[in-house]
Regions:
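A generic structural signal for solvent-exposed, polar alpha-helical segments
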Residues: 13-16, 39, 45, 139
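Generic low-complexity, intrinsically disordered sequence content enriched
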Residues: 10-15, 73-76, 106, 136
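N-terminal, active-site-proximal structural segment of metallo-dependent hydrolase catalytic domains
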Residues: 20-127
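Bacterial Sec-dependent N-terminal signal peptides
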Residues: 1-23
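Structured beta-strand-rich core segments of catalytic domains in phosphoester-bond hydrolases
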Residues: 96-171
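Basic side chains
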Residues: 2-3, 68, 160
């Protein structure tokens, strides 16, 4: 009597364990973060980025830039880790200057698993939206930048567009 009971108990435990693993694998995290003027220290031609250059209004130098990258990486790499150990499948970002800052961000400790999508838009300051994604959790199938329609009274017509990304979650 004892052996069949232990065998049934073993089967129940295995079933619960397999179900928990399946649920854990099906749990994904998504995040959004406004990185608030993530500018590098290099002037972009045809962009109004002078405030974020050495000697500019914010005296934006290598030390400030590097410090901001480290702080952002620390925050982003810890998002949702208690609930989803692998971290977010993707993270939307606002106010990114260009691909150089994203290259630098994904090289920071804790961010190495991420790749990114970003398009240069017409914003006069040069800030754009971007998507960081972990290719082990999310496969990009298509992406594009959709420019916003000018609104009544808009005289510049130069603003960030909408980043549209299609993809599949990993199974």
């Amino acid at each position: 009597m004892r052996k069949p009971f232990l065998f049934i108990l073993f089967l129940v435990a295995m079933s619960v364990s397999m179900q928990a693993q399946r649920l854990e694998r099906d749990l994904y995290s998504v995040a959004f973060y406004n990185v608030e003027n993530l500018f590098d220290t290099i002037h972009d031609v045809n962009k109004d980025d002078a405030e974020f250059l050495p000697g500019g209004r914010y005296d934006w130098g290598t030390r400030k830039y590097t410090s901001k990258l480290k702080r952002l990486a620390q925050v982003l790499s810890e998002l949702s880790r208690t609930e989803v150990p692998q971290g977010p499948a993707f993270i939307g970002l606002a106010e990114v200057e260009n691909s150089r800052v994203l290259d630098d961000l994904v090289k920071q400790p804790g961010m190495e698993q991420y790749r990114y999508i970003q398009y240069e838009g017409p914003d006069k300051r040069g800030i754009d939206c971007a998507l960081l994604y972990d290719p082990s959790q999310y496969e990009i199938t298509a992406s594009k930048l959709v420019l916003s329609e000018p609104f009544e009274g808009d005289t510049t017509h130069l603003t960030r567009g909408f980043l549209i990304v299609d993809g599949r979650l990993a199974n």
